[in-house]
Structures are given as C-alpha cells and as structure tokens.
Amino acid sequence: VFSILFIVGMVNSVNLTDGIDGLCATVSAVVCAFFAVFAFSVGDMGAATFSGAVIGGLLGFLIFNIYPAMGDTGSLFLGGAVTGLAYMLKYELIILLVGIVYFCEIMSVVLQVSYFRLTHGKRLFKMAPIHHHFEKLGFSESKIDLCAFAITAVFCIAAFFLIKY
C-alpha cells in the first residue's frame, strides 16, 4: 500500500512541476542523469540506457519545443519514469533527495491548502505550487528553471556521494 501511495504521490508531484515552460523537463533531465550515472556505476545497463533515452527525449524537447509546456501526458510519463528508475535501482527513497524540487512543489501545495483552512482564508504563499509564487515575486520562467536546475544538480551530486561513499 505504501509503495502505491508513494508512486502516485511522486508522479503527481512531477506533474505539478510542469506549471511553467521547461521546469519539469529541466529538473527531470538532471534527475535522469543522476540515475544514468548511478545505474552505470552499479552495472545496471538497462536502467542506464532507459535513463539516457529519457534524457535524449528531454533535450530534444527543451531545444525544439519549450513553449508551450509539455502537458499532463509528458509530465505524468516523466513522473513514472523517475519513480520507476528509483525502484529499478532499489533506491526508492533517494527520489526524495534527488527530486527535491518535486518534493518542494507538492509540499508547497499541501502547506498552502492547510494554512488556508487553518487561518480561514489567509495564504502562506502568493500562489502554489511554489514556482508560481516565485513568478508572482517577479522572477522570470528562465530564472526559475535555472535555479531549479542548480538545486537539483547539487542535490543529485550530494545523493551520489551519499550512496557511493
């Protein structure tokens, strides 16, 4: 039961990340790169190949089709792909670290709704998910994408060293 809830939650959190152009694809490309390197380091060529194929598709998407956002079909596939990779490699919970942006997106929605109900209409963020909050603060989509890329890359590198050493 926990696995089913975890998978559905992760897939939906990746879907929430697809609120601005390029965000879901950028973050997912970095997460898949982590899984490709990790899979290669443990000798799982199937997972490494699948990760590489997803990265290739995402790079093509980012170059040729960044506008409009990919939609639910693409983001739900990516959620299933990154969660499936975590399960294939037997490191299910590592997705909470390497997918920190996904986790922050879904938690911002949970916190916003909870706070709104507890305070009878007050908001914790200007808008949820969190990437829309940053948009309301004046950040451009490309700046939000770049920050999410950097945060994801740092957490993926940390996760790799945490696992390997």
Name the predicted role of every residue range.
Residues 2-165:
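Alpha-helical transmembrane segments
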